[in-house]
Amino acid sequence: MELYDLVKYLVNSFESLGIKYFITGSVASVYYGEPRFTNDIDVVAEIEESQISGLLKFFPEQEFYVNEETVRDAIRNKKLFNIIHPASGLKVDVIIRKENAFDNNRFLRIKRISPIEGTLVNISSPEDVIIMKMKYFKEGESEKHIRDITSMLKISGDSIDRGYVEKWAEKLNLRDIWKAILMKIQSDF
């Protein structure tokens, strides 16, 4: 199984179960920016406990590793759980939607795209991908997040609402990171 096969399968599974979701993280940043290798899919989802059995049927233990108790705990505590495809080494990080202004806003700004022939996918807006990548950089200082952001700004820069990014960077205490990224972009040109 290839990454985009798993994206397609995940999307079809979630949509069949009526799970609200959007793809974010590296898969989204690659869509808006430059290609790079990734073996994981980040998806934010609104999953109810009543949907767990259906979810597990779509990801049977013969092919996937999904721990039911971890799923249940993630839903109750608004955390994340993994779906792993051991044969390919691919992993899905399912991040349970939090009830806060930013997550609520992200769900309102979902883009519906067709990156895979014959499949429509809900994907995070580029601005929200940038904001989350800044947040992850602040938490762990991995340069890949900065590279992803600069790539997105170079490729999709004209279509990115920088005012929106600035507003949330201010609210989420990411202003200094955003300013440093903008200075880096200007010095690269």
PLM features per residue range, with description:
Residues 1-189:
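Compositionally biased terminal segments of proteins
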